[in-house]
Amino acid sequence: VSTEARRFRARRRERGAYSVMVDDETQPREKGRHLSPERSVSLPAEAITLLGQDGSLLQDLSLSIRRELENIVYLGPLRRKPERDYVWNKSKPGEVGSDGHRAIDVLLASALMKGDDQNRIIEGVSKWLVRMKVADRLEVKQLGRSTRYEVVIHSDGIEANLRDVGIGISQVLPVLTVAYFAPAGSTIMLEEPEIHLHPLAQSVLAELFAEVSKERNIQFIVETHSEHLFRRMQTLIARQHLTSSDAAMYFVEKKGRSARMHPLELDDFGRVKNWPQDFFGDALGETREQAALAIRRAKELRAKDGNVSG
Protein backbone atom coordinates (compact mmCIF):
# COMPACT_ATOMS: atom_id res chain seq x y z
CA VAL A 1 0.00 0.00 0.00
CA SER A 2 1.49 3.36 -0.93
CA THR A 3 1.01 7.09 -1.39
CA GLU A 4 3.09 9.38 -3.57
CA ALA A 5 5.51 9.79 -0.66
CA ARG A 6 5.40 6.59 1.40
CA ARG A 7 5.26 2.85 0.72
CA PHE A 8 4.22 0.13 3.16
CA ARG A 9 4.89 -3.57 2.62
CA ALA A 10 3.84 -6.74 4.41
CA ARG A 11 5.86 -9.67 3.06
CA ARG A 12 4.99 -13.27 3.80
CA ARG A 13 7.78 -15.30 5.34
CA GLU A 14 8.04 -18.93 6.37
CA ARG A 15 5.27 -20.72 8.27
CA GLY A 16 2.70 -17.98 7.86
CA ALA A 17 4.79 -15.22 9.43
CA TYR A 18 4.83 -11.71 7.95
CA SER A 19 7.43 -8.95 8.05
CA VAL A 20 6.52 -5.26 7.90
CA MET A 21 8.71 -2.73 6.07
CA VAL A 22 8.41 0.94 5.14
CA ASP A 23 9.74 2.58 1.96
CA ASP A 24 13.04 0.97 0.87
CA GLU A 25 13.92 -0.61 4.19
CA THR A 26 15.77 -3.89 3.80
CA GLN A 27 15.32 -4.97 7.40
CA PRO A 28 11.78 -5.45 8.71
CA ARG A 29 10.47 -3.44 11.65
CA GLU A 30 9.24 -6.74 13.05
CA LYS A 31 8.00 -10.12 11.84
CA GLY A 32 5.51 -12.70 13.06
CA ARG A 33 2.13 -14.26 12.44
CA HIS A 34 0.43 -11.50 14.41
CA LEU A 35 1.31 -9.07 11.58
CA SER A 36 -0.80 -10.89 8.96
CA PRO A 37 -2.67 -8.34 6.75
CA GLU A 38 -6.41 -7.92 7.10
CA ARG A 39 -8.44 -7.92 3.84
CA SER A 40 -5.16 -7.40 1.92
CA VAL A 41 -5.18 -3.59 2.27
CA SER A 42 -4.76 -3.05 6.02
CA LEU A 43 -2.62 -4.29 8.89
CA PRO A 44 -3.72 -5.37 12.40
CA ALA A 45 -3.57 -3.07 15.42
CA GLU A 46 -0.21 -4.54 16.54
CA ALA A 47 1.42 -3.50 13.27
CA ILE A 48 -0.16 -0.03 13.36
CA THR A 49 1.23 0.55 16.86
CA LEU A 50 4.64 -0.75 15.78
CA LEU A 51 4.81 1.81 12.93
CA GLY A 52 4.15 4.82 15.18
CA GLN A 53 3.32 7.96 13.15
CA ASP A 54 3.59 5.93 9.94
CA GLY A 55 0.93 3.64 11.38
CA SER A 56 -1.62 6.47 11.53
CA LEU A 57 -0.88 7.34 7.89
CA LEU A 58 -1.25 3.70 6.86
CA GLN A 59 -4.51 3.38 8.79
CA ASP A 60 -6.01 6.41 7.03
CA LEU A 61 -4.80 5.14 3.66
CA SER A 62 -6.23 1.67 4.23
CA LEU A 63 -9.57 3.13 5.31
CA SER A 64 -9.75 5.21 2.12
CA ILE A 65 -9.03 2.14 -0.02
CA ARG A 66 -11.64 0.07 1.78
CA ARG A 67 -14.24 2.79 1.26
CA GLU A 68 -13.43 2.87 -2.45
CA LEU A 69 -13.73 -0.92 -2.67
CA GLU A 70 -17.10 -0.77 -0.91
CA ASN A 71 -18.31 1.58 -3.66
CA ILE A 72 -17.70 -1.08 -6.34
CA VAL A 73 -20.71 -3.06 -7.57
CA TYR A 74 -20.13 -6.12 -9.77
CA LEU A 75 -22.56 -7.88 -12.11
CA GLY A 76 -21.37 -10.99 -13.92
CA PRO A 77 -21.99 -12.12 -17.52
CA LEU A 78 -24.69 -14.73 -16.84
CA ARG A 79 -27.63 -13.40 -14.88
CA ARG A 80 -29.96 -15.80 -13.08
CA LYS A 81 -33.12 -16.90 -14.89
CA PRO A 82 -36.30 -15.31 -13.51
CA GLU A 83 -38.89 -17.13 -11.42
CA ARG A 84 -42.58 -17.13 -12.28
CA ASP A 85 -43.43 -15.29 -9.06
CA TYR A 86 -41.67 -13.91 -6.00
CA VAL A 87 -42.36 -13.50 -2.30
CA TRP A 88 -41.88 -9.93 -1.09
CA ASN A 89 -40.84 -9.57 2.55
CA LYS A 90 -41.61 -5.82 2.63
CA SER A 91 -37.96 -4.83 2.83
CA LYS A 92 -35.37 -3.34 0.50
CA PRO A 93 -32.41 -5.61 -0.39
CA GLY A 94 -28.88 -4.40 0.19
CA GLU A 95 -27.50 -5.58 -3.15
CA VAL A 96 -28.47 -6.87 -6.58
CA GLY A 97 -26.00 -9.78 -6.38
CA SER A 98 -23.21 -10.76 -8.75
CA ASP A 99 -25.66 -12.85 -10.81
CA GLY A 100 -28.52 -10.36 -10.48
CA HIS A 101 -30.63 -12.71 -8.33
CA ARG A 102 -31.88 -9.82 -6.13
CA ALA A 103 -32.80 -7.53 -9.03
CA ILE A 104 -36.48 -8.48 -8.86
CA ASP A 105 -36.51 -7.88 -5.10
CA VAL A 106 -35.17 -4.39 -5.82
CA LEU A 107 -37.95 -3.80 -8.36
CA LEU A 108 -40.60 -5.09 -5.95
CA ALA A 109 -39.38 -2.72 -3.25
CA SER A 110 -39.31 0.16 -5.75
CA ALA A 111 -42.88 -0.51 -6.88
CA LEU A 112 -44.45 -1.35 -3.50
CA MET A 113 -42.64 0.66 -0.81
CA LYS A 114 -43.82 4.17 -0.04
CA GLY A 115 -41.50 7.12 -0.44
CA ASP A 116 -40.73 9.95 -2.82
CA ASP A 117 -37.67 8.23 -4.27
CA GLN A 118 -38.89 4.63 -4.33
CA ASN A 119 -40.46 4.56 -7.80
CA ARG A 120 -37.30 5.99 -9.38
CA ILE A 121 -35.76 2.55 -9.97
CA ILE A 122 -38.70 0.80 -11.62
CA GLU A 123 -39.49 3.92 -13.68
CA GLY A 124 -35.89 4.11 -14.87
CA VAL A 125 -35.86 0.42 -15.81
CA SER A 126 -39.15 0.75 -17.71
CA LYS A 127 -37.87 3.80 -19.59
CA TRP A 128 -34.83 1.95 -20.93
CA LEU A 129 -36.82 -1.14 -21.87
CA VAL A 130 -38.93 1.16 -24.05
CA ARG A 131 -35.88 2.86 -25.57
CA MET A 132 -34.43 -0.53 -26.38
CA LYS A 133 -37.75 -1.44 -28.07
CA VAL A 134 -38.01 -4.69 -26.13
CA ALA A 135 -41.09 -3.73 -24.07
CA ASP A 136 -43.70 -1.02 -23.64
CA ARG A 137 -43.96 -1.24 -19.88
CA LEU A 138 -42.93 -3.27 -16.83
CA GLU A 139 -45.47 -3.95 -14.09
CA VAL A 140 -45.51 -5.68 -10.70
CA LYS A 141 -48.75 -7.58 -9.97
CA GLN A 142 -49.90 -9.11 -6.70
CA LEU A 143 -51.23 -12.68 -6.92
CA GLY A 144 -54.56 -12.50 -5.11
CA ARG A 145 -54.14 -11.46 -1.47
CA SER A 146 -50.92 -13.37 -1.01
CA THR A 147 -47.42 -12.03 -0.46
CA ARG A 148 -46.44 -13.35 -3.89
CA TYR A 149 -45.95 -11.08 -6.89
CA GLU A 150 -45.21 -11.54 -10.56
CA VAL A 151 -43.34 -9.27 -12.95
CA VAL A 152 -45.33 -8.61 -16.11
CA ILE A 153 -43.94 -7.30 -19.39
CA HIS A 154 -46.29 -5.33 -21.66
CA SER A 155 -45.48 -5.29 -25.38
CA ASP A 156 -47.70 -4.49 -28.40
CA GLY A 157 -50.87 -4.77 -26.34
CA ILE A 158 -49.91 -8.17 -24.92
CA GLU A 159 -48.85 -8.85 -21.35
CA ALA A 160 -46.69 -11.81 -20.37
CA ASN A 161 -44.94 -13.09 -17.27
CA LEU A 162 -41.24 -12.22 -17.24
CA ARG A 163 -40.38 -15.92 -17.38
CA ASP A 164 -42.30 -16.31 -20.66
CA VAL A 165 -40.65 -13.50 -22.65
CA GLY A 166 -37.35 -13.53 -24.53
CA ILE A 167 -34.29 -14.25 -22.42
CA GLY A 168 -32.73 -10.96 -23.50
CA ILE A 169 -35.13 -8.99 -21.28
CA SER A 170 -34.41 -11.11 -18.21
CA GLN A 171 -30.66 -10.81 -18.84
CA VAL A 172 -30.66 -7.02 -19.25
CA LEU A 173 -33.09 -6.36 -16.37
CA PRO A 174 -30.38 -6.66 -13.65
CA VAL A 175 -28.13 -4.35 -15.72
CA LEU A 176 -30.81 -1.66 -15.83
CA THR A 177 -31.72 -2.23 -12.18
CA VAL A 178 -28.19 -1.91 -10.83
CA ALA A 179 -27.68 1.31 -12.83
CA TYR A 180 -30.36 2.98 -10.68
CA PHE A 181 -29.99 0.94 -7.47
CA ALA A 182 -26.26 1.44 -6.86
CA PRO A 183 -25.59 4.48 -4.65
CA ALA A 184 -24.69 7.67 -6.49
CA GLY A 185 -20.92 7.89 -6.92
CA SER A 186 -20.48 4.11 -7.22
CA THR A 187 -18.34 2.20 -9.70
CA ILE A 188 -20.36 -0.48 -11.52
CA MET A 189 -18.45 -3.32 -13.17
CA LEU A 190 -20.39 -5.21 -15.86
CA GLU A 191 -19.46 -8.25 -17.91
CA GLU A 192 -21.22 -8.67 -21.26
CA PRO A 193 -24.30 -6.54 -20.51
CA GLU A 194 -25.39 -7.04 -24.15
CA ILE A 195 -25.89 -10.80 -23.94
CA HIS A 196 -28.99 -12.07 -25.84
CA LEU A 197 -30.01 -8.54 -26.92
CA HIS A 198 -30.74 -7.57 -30.52
CA PRO A 199 -28.41 -5.00 -32.20
CA LEU A 200 -30.54 -1.90 -31.48
CA ALA A 201 -30.83 -2.74 -27.79
CA GLN A 202 -27.08 -3.32 -27.61
CA SER A 203 -26.52 0.14 -29.09
CA VAL A 204 -28.88 1.76 -26.57
CA LEU A 205 -26.77 0.34 -23.73
CA ALA A 206 -24.11 2.91 -24.65
CA GLU A 207 -26.70 5.67 -24.15
CA LEU A 208 -27.67 4.16 -20.79
CA PHE A 209 -24.08 4.26 -19.57
CA ALA A 210 -23.54 7.82 -20.81
CA GLU A 211 -26.74 9.26 -19.35
CA VAL A 212 -26.74 7.46 -16.00
CA SER A 213 -23.06 8.28 -15.55
CA LYS A 214 -23.86 11.99 -15.81
CA GLU A 215 -27.13 11.89 -13.86
CA ARG A 216 -25.88 9.80 -10.92
CA ASN A 217 -22.09 10.26 -11.03
CA ILE A 218 -21.65 6.55 -11.77
CA GLN A 219 -18.48 5.13 -13.30
CA PHE A 220 -19.16 2.12 -15.53
CA ILE A 221 -16.42 -0.41 -16.27
CA VAL A 222 -17.79 -2.60 -19.05
CA GLU A 223 -16.36 -5.75 -20.64
CA THR A 224 -18.11 -6.28 -23.96
CA HIS A 225 -17.87 -8.09 -27.29
CA SER A 226 -20.56 -5.91 -28.86
CA GLU A 227 -19.57 -3.91 -31.93
CA HIS A 228 -23.00 -2.21 -31.77
CA LEU A 229 -22.35 -0.88 -28.25
CA PHE A 230 -18.86 0.23 -29.23
CA ARG A 231 -20.03 2.01 -32.40
CA ARG A 232 -22.80 3.86 -30.55
CA MET A 233 -20.28 5.05 -27.99
CA GLN A 234 -18.23 6.48 -30.86
CA THR A 235 -21.35 8.18 -32.21
CA LEU A 236 -22.12 9.73 -28.82
CA ILE A 237 -18.66 11.28 -28.83
CA ALA A 238 -19.19 12.55 -32.38
CA ARG A 239 -22.54 14.06 -31.29
CA GLN A 240 -20.72 15.76 -28.39
CA HIS A 241 -22.92 13.97 -25.85
CA LEU A 242 -19.61 12.68 -24.47
CA THR A 243 -16.02 13.78 -24.84
CA SER A 244 -13.20 11.41 -25.69
CA SER A 245 -11.95 11.88 -22.12
CA ASP A 246 -15.32 10.75 -20.68
CA ALA A 247 -15.07 7.27 -22.17
CA ALA A 248 -11.78 5.39 -22.06
CA MET A 249 -11.71 2.29 -24.26
CA TYR A 250 -9.27 -0.60 -24.19
CA PHE A 251 -8.54 -3.60 -26.37
CA VAL A 252 -7.46 -6.77 -24.56
CA GLU A 253 -4.88 -8.79 -26.46
CA LYS A 254 -4.22 -12.35 -25.37
CA LYS A 255 -0.71 -13.72 -25.79
CA GLY A 256 -0.19 -17.25 -24.57
CA ARG A 257 -1.29 -17.41 -20.95
CA SER A 258 -1.14 -13.67 -20.40
CA ALA A 259 -3.22 -10.72 -21.58
CA ARG A 260 -2.41 -7.06 -22.15
CA MET A 261 -4.68 -4.03 -22.24
CA HIS A 262 -4.07 -1.53 -25.01
CA PRO A 263 -5.77 1.89 -24.81
CA LEU A 264 -7.66 2.93 -27.94
CA GLU A 265 -6.95 6.53 -28.89
CA LEU A 266 -10.11 8.40 -29.88
CA ASP A 267 -10.31 11.86 -31.41
CA ASP A 268 -13.09 14.39 -30.78
CA PHE A 269 -15.21 12.76 -33.50
CA GLY A 270 -15.10 9.31 -31.89
CA ARG A 271 -12.70 7.94 -34.49
CA VAL A 272 -10.10 5.42 -33.34
CA LYS A 273 -6.57 6.42 -34.30
CA ASN A 274 -4.88 3.10 -33.50
CA TRP A 275 -7.17 0.28 -34.65
CA PRO A 276 -5.76 -3.13 -33.65
CA GLN A 277 -5.45 -5.54 -36.55
CA ASP A 278 -8.70 -7.46 -37.20
CA PHE A 279 -10.35 -5.76 -34.22
CA PHE A 280 -13.81 -6.30 -35.73
CA GLY A 281 -12.66 -8.74 -38.38
CA ASP A 282 -12.09 -7.55 -41.94
CA ALA A 283 -15.19 -5.34 -42.26
CA LEU A 284 -13.87 -3.47 -45.31
CA GLY A 285 -12.89 -6.74 -46.99
CA GLU A 286 -16.36 -8.18 -46.34
CA THR A 287 -17.98 -5.09 -47.90
CA ARG A 288 -15.75 -5.24 -50.96
CA GLU A 289 -16.44 -8.94 -51.48
CA GLN A 290 -20.20 -8.43 -51.12
CA ALA A 291 -20.14 -5.58 -53.67
CA ALA A 292 -18.07 -7.61 -56.16
CA LEU A 293 -20.36 -10.63 -55.81
CA ALA A 294 -23.46 -8.45 -56.22
CA ILE A 295 -22.08 -6.91 -59.43
CA ARG A 296 -21.14 -10.32 -60.81
CA ARG A 297 -24.54 -11.79 -59.93
CA ALA A 298 -26.33 -8.83 -61.55
CA LYS A 299 -24.34 -9.35 -64.77
CA GLU A 300 -25.18 -13.06 -64.78
CA LEU A 301 -28.89 -12.33 -64.34
CA ARG A 302 -28.87 -9.72 -67.14
CA ALA A 303 -27.08 -12.15 -69.45
CA LYS A 304 -29.58 -14.87 -68.58
CA ASP A 305 -32.52 -12.53 -69.27
CA GLY A 306 -30.98 -11.57 -72.63
CA ASN A 307 -30.64 -15.20 -73.66
CA VAL A 308 -34.25 -15.90 -72.70
CA SER A 309 -35.49 -12.89 -74.71
CA GLY A 310 -33.46 -13.97 -77.76
Which residue stretches match the model-derived regions?
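A generic signature of intrinsically disordered, low-complexity regions enriched in glycine/proline
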Residues: Q27-P28, A109, R271
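P-loop NTPase switch/coupling surface
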Residues: V1-R79, V140, I237-T243, A247-K254, ...
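Switch/communication elements of ASCE P-loop NTPase nucleotide-binding domains
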Residues: D116-A298, A303
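Intrinsically disordered regions, especially transient/low-confidence alpha-helical propensity segments
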Residues: A5, R15, E83-D85, V125, ...
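Polar low-complexity intrinsically disordered regions enriched in Ser/Thr and small residues
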Residues: S19, G100-A103, K273, L284, ...
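Extended helical coiled-coil dimerization/tether regions that scaffold
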Residues: P44-D164, A298-G310
